[in-house]
Swiss-Prot record:
UniProt keywords, alphabetically: Amino-acid biosynthesis, Cytoplasm, NADP, Oxidoreductase, Proline biosynthesis
Organism: Escherichia coli (strain 55989 / EAEC)
Gene: proA
HAMAP family: ProA (MF_00412)
One Pfam family this sequence matches: Aldedh
Protein name (record): Gamma-glutamyl phosphate reductase
Length: 417
């Protein structure tokens, strides 16, 4: 099955690579229209997925990611239309020169070819990834979480109908709808057809891909994000940022999971934090130093377990640790962070600059929420993933991250001397 999918995707990629920006946008507009026109089919399939997932004990955070509503589906269709408005990087001349030989040399952006994406139970990812791949002239093979099998099958069928109505092969967007995990291992060895693999999921999936894949892999999406509260912070303003970073949408990878508090401000900061977290329904997981002060406050508080510093809660839970100074905070982030998103709250710009320079994450913030790490917020449009590695992309992966480049030399029967 996967062999045939690979062949179809590779053949489709050749045709997609030749499309103009106008032709690609026409396809995307058709997809957006069809998602709305056939919304009942997709929503019915999703309702079955959600019912099964709930019966199987899936947590509320994951159920929230899985569920579609008419409003959410319309938002997904609107996101596809937004991709139409983004500048197409394909064909862009990055740089060029004329060599001493007279050869005109240029470096031009081109599609990668076929992208493979393994991702969690999030139906919007199916459409986001497909639209970005099509915009950049790439074919894509999708393998979503088993909880979304019906939703993904219905959504991809709608996308394929739109492709065919525009004269393009259905192989441009395909989904593996068999939940058999053995197919993931098979997919990891499809280097004959897939040019880049993006796993979005937990540490176990990332480890599997790194160890077994014969395809270049870009990992990301695991966000053990930190906020360091410096001693010079403005407490009221800091609390606004922390509430946003923790509670706006706890199930996302850019949500803060650990709060590091400078010991010199702990006495005044922790009571205010407890009050705010109680109002927000957040459970605090505190180290010994913080626990002594937080136990008298209104927020629910428990003693932190050592392993929780490495946890991505994806829920209304927040680690709180007292640190000696900026050096201590940076050391903690280096040991427990996932190089996703980390922030400092401070009025001391020297400390801010040190934090920016010394914290080696894909996104580092000064006096701002970690929730900004998002393709839409960065002006990139929908994102394929948030890469936490350094090659070939880092941070939110928009259109440019789905391209590579080729060198083109134009001569006049020019030969090398």
């Amino acid at each position: 099955m996967l062999e045939q999918m690979g062949i179809a995707a590779k053949q489709a990629s050749y045709k997609l690579a030749q499309l103009s920006s106008r032709e690609k946008n026409r396809v995307l507009e058709k997809i957006a229209d069809e998602l709305e026109a056939q919304s009942e089919i997709i929503l019915n399939a999703n309702a079955q997925d959600v019912a099964d997932a709930r019966a199987n004990g899936l947590g509320e955070a994951m159920l929230d990611r899985l569920a579609l509503t008419p409003a959410r589906l319309k938002g997904i269709a609107d996101d596809v239309r937004q991709v139409c408005n983004l500048a197409d990087p394909v064909g862009q001349v990055i740089d060029g020169s004329v060599l001493d030989s007279g050869l005109r040399l240029e470096r031009r952006r081109v599609p990668l070819g076929v992208i493979g994406v393994i991702y969690e139970a999030r139906p919007n990812v199916t459409v986001d990834v497909a639209s970005l791949c099509l915009k950049t002239g790439n074919a894509v093979i999708l393998r979503g979480g088993k909880e979304t099998c019906r939703t993904n099958a219905a959504t991809v069928a709608v996308i394929q109908d739109a492709l065919k109505s525009c004269g393009l092969p259905a192989g441009a967007v395909q989904a593996i709808d068999n939940p058999d995990r053995a197919l993931v291992s098979e997919m990891l060895r499809m280097d004959k057809y897939i040019d880049m693999l993006i796993p979005r999921g937990g540490a176990g999936l990332h480890k599997l891909c790194r160890e077994q894949s014969t395809i270049p892999v870009i990992t990301g999406g695991i966000g053990v994000c930190h906020i360091y509260v410096d001693e010079s912070v403005e407490i009221a303003e800091a609390l606004k940022v922390i509430v946003n970073a923790k509670t706006q949408r706890p199930s996302t990878c850019n949500t803060v999971e650990t709060l590091l508090v400078n010991k010199n401000i702990a006495d005044s900061f922790l009571p205010a934090l407890s009050k705010q977290m109680a109002e927000s329904g957040v459970t605090l997981h505190a180290d010994a130093a913080a626990l002594a002060q937080l136990q008298t406050g209104p927020a629910k508080v428990v003693a932190v377990k050592a392993e929780e510093y490495d946890d991505e809660f994806l829920s209304l839970d927040l680690n709180v640790k007292i640190v000696s100074d900026l050096d201590d905070a940076i050391a903690h982030i280096r040991e427990h962070g996932t190089e996703h998103s980390d922030a400092i709250l401070t009025r001391d710009m020297r400390n801010a600059q040190r934090f920016v320079n010394e914290v080696d994450s894909s996104a580092v913030y000064v006096n701002a929420s970690t929730r900004f790490t998002d393709g839409g917020q960065f002006g990139l449009g929908a994102e394929v993933a948030v890469s936490t590695q350094k090659l070939h992309a880092r941070g939110p992966m928009g259109l440019e991250a789905l391209t590579t480049y080729k060198w083109i030399g134009i001569g006049d029967y020019t030969i090398r001397a």
